[in-house]
Every structure is written in C-alpha cells, then in structure tokens.
Amino acid sequence: MSGSNGDKRVIGLYGEMRLAMELHKRGWQVYSAYIDEKFDFVILKSYCENCQTFKDAWTREGTYIDKKGNEKKGKTVTQLCETCHQDSLKMLVRFIQVKTSEGIPGKKTKSGEEVKKYSFHARIRYHLADSRIFYAWIQVWDEDNVNYYIFKTEDVALFDNLQIVSYQTTDNQKTTLRINKEGTVLNEGTKHDYSAFEDFRDNFDCLEDLIEGDCWK
C-alpha cells in the first residue's frame, strides 16, 4: 500500500475485522463505536458470580399450549446461568483501542530471516485511571500471518517513557519495532526493554482477568 490516508483506513478496518472475529471466537460480544472518538471496541462477556467463571445464559426449553389448544415446543434465552440456573450473571466490560500496522520491509537478519518494521503510536489520552482499558496492536504480515499484542494502556510504561516531552505534548509517541513473520520482536533496546511484547503476543487471556474496575455492587 502507498501509505495514503485511504490506505491507512483500509488496513485499520481490516485489523478491526480480524480482531473482532478473534474476540467473538473466544466468547466476547463485540461492539464498535458508532462515532470515532476515544475507544474502537467495547466488548462484553457474561460471568457467573455463583460459579465464579465465564458462563452463557441458560436456554430454557419446554412445551406450551397455543391459542388453538395445540401442544408446541419452545425455547427462550433466560437471564440465568447455563450451569447453576441462578440469577447470577454479570457482564464483564472491556474498552479496547485498536491499532493496526502493515509493516515496511526491513533489513534481513544475519541468518537471512525476513523482517519488517512496524510502528505503534501510544497516545496519552487513553492512559486513564481505569484498568479496563486495553490496547490491541495488530501486526499484519500478510493475510495468513497476523499477530495480536494485547496489553493494558498502563503497560506502555514497560517499553517507553511516558514522561518525555513528545509523549506529554504531541499525544503521539511512536515506537518502531523490528518484527519477524512469527511476531517475535527483534529490538534489543538499551533504554527500554521490549521483551514485554512476548507476553503481550496473542494475550487474549488478560482480557478475562478480574480487575478492580469489575465491581457490580
């Protein structure tokens, strides 16, 4: 792609579509912002406080008599847990800012491995006092090779300095990483440690961790 604004929108929408499918596959309900302001996705997943695990709603099946006196079979989705049948389902909420990078071919490694340069733009506006806010940075190598780096906005501090002037005044601090097809970050920084990206990669499980903001009372 040429890098125009239109191309960036296309790759951005592609990344969001791929991420939405991955989240849906893992049981999340995915809602996209109607107006593009702060967060791209709001995702929900039902959690049973009684079972203390993620559960879907119970679909009750039974028979009933219709107006003509005929016996019919029917089913309805209830508000109850599918396992314990208690009214104990709560919705876990996560807010996600999605970033997608297509990458620019870079210099190969000494072993001849192909590498691309990807840029991640952290923005201070997303660094709120709310642990339910996450970044999903999507590395698109090609159609068959897509990696997802999932982390809290506060985790930017693990690989960048949030106090530098450019981050505080321009709202657009760029981190450029050399990444191979498998999604391994090859940067070896002296000021910053990029090993955190190994923990971030395909870290969809972190979205399910119960955190301080998950208060239903």
PLM region spans:
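Mixed-charge (Asp/Glu-Lys/Arg
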Residues: M1-E37, I43-K217
